Design a protein with these regions (language model features):
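A short alpha/beta connector and helix-capping loop motif
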Residues: 21-54
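Glycine-rich tight-turn/loop motif centered on a GG-T
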Residues: 29, 39-46, 77-92, 126-130, ...
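Acidic (Asp/Glu)-rich catalytic clusters
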Residues: 30-34, 55-68, 107-110
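N-terminal active-site wall of soluble small-molecule enzyme domains
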Residues: 75-77, 107, 112-114, 124-139
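Glycine-rich, Lys/Arg-enriched anion-binding loops that position phosphate/diphosphate groups
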Residues: 106, 129-162
């Protein structure tokens, strides 16, 4: 009988969090934080607000979960799922604004944003549009070259992030 080798595998479960805003509660962030390794925090344009972002950062820190920004098109009513045609300057600024907001909140709590994962229509469009993907990747790198850009494999966004 052959002896099989044990292989240790690390799996990082990732989830979108902080999608409540105002009086509206969305999802069970506390339950998810118990099982995930990294969180994509809504940055206010598709969901979330400054208070929710602050609380989500606090809870993630307590759970030892790494933080990621989850920027979206300015589409609160459509939950960031409606396509928008933004100029490269507008797109870059929208991404920078949202990532910067989360970075400031995280820093105020002694934490660090480790990654960026575009949300909804922004992500879907950038996965197919090389110019849009490049705009997002350049914006993320300009903010902090150490940030990881999360993207689906074989997408234009993944290629731009390299």
């Amino acid at each position: 009988m052959q002896k099989t080798e044990e292989i240790e595998v690390d799996i990082n479960l990732n989830a979108d969090l902080g999608e409540s805003f105002g009086a509206w509660r969305m999802g069970d962030d506390r339950a998810l934080l118990a099982v995930i390794g990294s969180a994509n925090v809504a940055c206010g344009f598709h969901a979330g607000d400054p208070l929710v972002m602050t609380e989500t950062v606090r809870l993630a820190g307590e759970a030892g979960v790494s933080l990621g920004a989850h920027p979206a098109f300015p589409d609160l009513q459509g939950f960031g799922r409606r396509e928008m045609q933004l100029s490269p300057r507008e797109l870059s600024t929208v991404v920078t604004y949202q990532v910067g907001a989360l970075m400031g909140i995280a820093q105020s709590q002694g934490q660090r944003v480790t990654h960026v994962k575009p949300h909804g229509a922004m992500s879907n469009m950038a996965c197919q549009d090389a110019a849009m993907a490049a705009t997002i990747a350049v914006a993320v790198k300009a903010i902090d070259a150490q940030l990881i850009l999360l993207a689906p494999a074989l997408s234009e966004l993944a290629a731009a992030g390299r």
